[in-house]
Swiss-Prot record:
Source species, domain of life: Bacteria
A GO MF label: thymidylate synthase activity
Keyword presence, Methyltransferase: yes
Subunit structure: Homodimer.
Family: Belongs to the thymidylate synthase family. Bacterial-type ThyA subfamily.
Physiological role: Catalyzes the reductive methylation of 2'-deoxyuridine-5'-monophosphate (dUMP) to 2'-deoxythymidine-5'-monophosphate (dTMP) while utilizing 5,10-methylenetetrahydrofolate (mTHF) as the methyl donor and reductant in the reaction, yielding dihydrofolate (DHF) as a by-product. This enzymatic reaction provides an intracellular de novo source of dTMP, an essential precursor for DNA biosynthesis.
Organism encoding this protein: Agrobacterium fabrum (strain C58 / ATCC 33970) (Agrobacterium tumefaciens (strain C58))
Active-site residues, record numbering mapped to chain: 146
Protein name (record): Thymidylate synthase
Amino acid sequence: MKQYLDLLRHVMETGSDRGDRTGTGTRSVFGYQMRFDLSEGFPVLTTKKLHLRSIIHELLWFLNGDTNIAYLKENGVSIWDEWADENGDLGPVYGAQWRSWPAPDGRHIDQIALLIEALKTNPNSRRHIVSAWNPALVDEMALPPCHCLFQFYVSDGKLSCQLYQRSADIFLGVPFNIASYALLTLMVAQVVGLKPGDFVHTLGDAHIYANHFEQAQLQMTRTPKALPTMRLNPDVKNLFGFKFEDFTLENYEADSSIKAPIAV
């Protein structure tokens, strides 16, 4: 995807070298936006192969409101292992905030269910927002939300999504985030009876870790291939009814994977 390679190049060429929480060091810019027209194909990287199984299972795990890595481990997904405690718990991370945001009066708010209902009954609303950033609980989370708020927008029978990501690990994390929220947009569009529109990805602190510079330079030498097509099982009409087997990625051709260490 040209949009992603442009981001890599922009940060490598114009970014500021800074320290960070992990002690690794980064090169970063503040504020960057990419736009993907989902009618042109599914935005998954072709300049390195991604582990799509991890992306799908993580999204289903979020939507289930789960915050323990047991489901992920059972399905061969290890991306959260570094942050879990000895029992596999992560604290009130994404799934808890999406599906069970605690209200002051003791209620728990299912933001995703409310979102789906609002998209069906009041599509022109400007309040189709889900937030994972709960200041009262951030300190209890194993990792505070990086992709922390998203909003849907309906126009001309199409559903678009914009994500705000406060902290963006460009080499390892952002490719997953693009594919994950593009997939979420396809899923939500199907269950509310709309066509997919755009996925807009807005980044706050957009950074490349110092120990990813060599890998980023390698990736920038590669030429993007045609985007694949993501097929969803058309019989699924409930967002919480999707299973891993309901997704098929067709015509995905990608260059070899590029290994890089994760900063914890």
